[in-house]
UniProtKB/Swiss-Prot annotation:
It comes from Acetivibrio thermocellus (strain ATCC 27405 / DSM 1237 / JCM 9322 / NBRC 103400 / NCIMB 10682 / NRRL B-4536 / VPI 7372) (Clostridium thermocellum). HAMAP family: 16SrRNA_methyltr_G. This is Ribosomal RNA small subunit methyltransferase G. Its main location: cytoplasm. Keywords: Cytoplasm, Methyltransferase, rRNA processing, S-adenosyl-L-methionine, Transferase. It is found in: Cytoplasm. Belongs to the methyltransferase superfamily. RNA methyltransferase RsmG family. GO terms for cellular component: cytosol. Specifically methylates the N7 position of a guanine in 16S rRNA. S-adenosyl-L-methionine binds at residues 82, 87, 133-134, 152. It is an enzyme of class 2 (transferase).
Length: 242
């Protein structure tokens, strides 16, 4: 193992431990295998603008691990909505192998990449679905079937709520990973009321070894989402519940 890899492993270990996550050697190896597949596939398709090893570890892996303290019980079903290159779903699965994870994305070529990662990392109880959130949110096989939904997406919080809360069982939660702005929370009161959610916690922090600000918003689902939500594809983003 060369000096560069030792430095990268140290970054991953220390970054994860900042969120109370102690990675063993097997988990670290899986993260590095994931990094290699990501860089390999990124040559032929646009998965991430982040290509530097340190930045992948910090802005993708450790950023994803930051939600692990919220997941109290490990034997749960989690859906990652608009997962893209697998964040945060795959890192969370590596940390908590017992979780049952579904990775949802609207681009088929991304789900092919994700299936390759799952196979190479030999991950169990994790699968992909190529679909839009609006389609699967009304599907009885998906609707209110998950303890946790997560999204690390650029859509506004009212839009994410309509995408993600329909998947969550009453009593479960939606974890929204946002940048450094909490102003969207004010604009989400109507969506929360309509969709059956309430804000339980807002975690504000900097990513380790950086001045990159993050906000993680935890929304508890306290009643069923009305059957007319989510609305048809495109509607939530064009006409948010604000």
């Amino acid at each position: 193992m060369d000096e560069k890899e030792l430095k990268l492993r140290k970054l991953l270990i220390e970054g994860a431990s900042g969120f109370g996550v102690n990675l063993d050697d097997e988990q670290i190896d899986k993260f590095f295998a994931y990094k290699d597949v990501l860089k390999e596939w990124n040559q032929k398709m646009n998965l991430t603008a982040i290509e530097d090893d340190e930045e992948i570890i910090l802005k993708h892996f450790i950023d994803s691990i930051s939600i692990c303290p919220i997941i109290k019980d490990k034997n749960l079903a989690l859906i990652d909505v608009g997962t893209g290159a697998g964040f945060p779903g795959i890192p969370v699965k590596i940390v908590f192998p017992e979780l049952k994870v579904k990775l949802l994305d609207s681009l088929e070529k991304r789900t092919k990449f994700l299936n390759e990662v799952i196979e190479r990392l030999d991950l169990k109880d994790i699968s992909t679905v190529h679909a839009r959130a609006e389609e699967k949110g009304v599907d009885p096989d998906y609707r209110e079937k998950y303890d946790i939904s997560v999204a690390r997406a650029v859509a506004s919080l009212p839009v994410l709520l309509e995408y993600c809360l329909p998947f969550v069982k009453v009593g479960g939660c939606f974890i929204a990973m946002k940048g450094n702005s909490t102003e969207e929370v004010e604009n989400s009161k109507k969506a929360l009321e309509i969709l059956g959610g309430k804000i339980e916690d807002i975690l504000e922090f900097n990513l380790p070894f950086s001045d990159i600000k993050r906000n993680v918003i935890v929304i508890k689902k306290f009643r069923q989402t009305p059957t007319k939500y989510p609305r048809k594809s495109g509607k939530p983003s064009k006409n948010p519940l604000t």
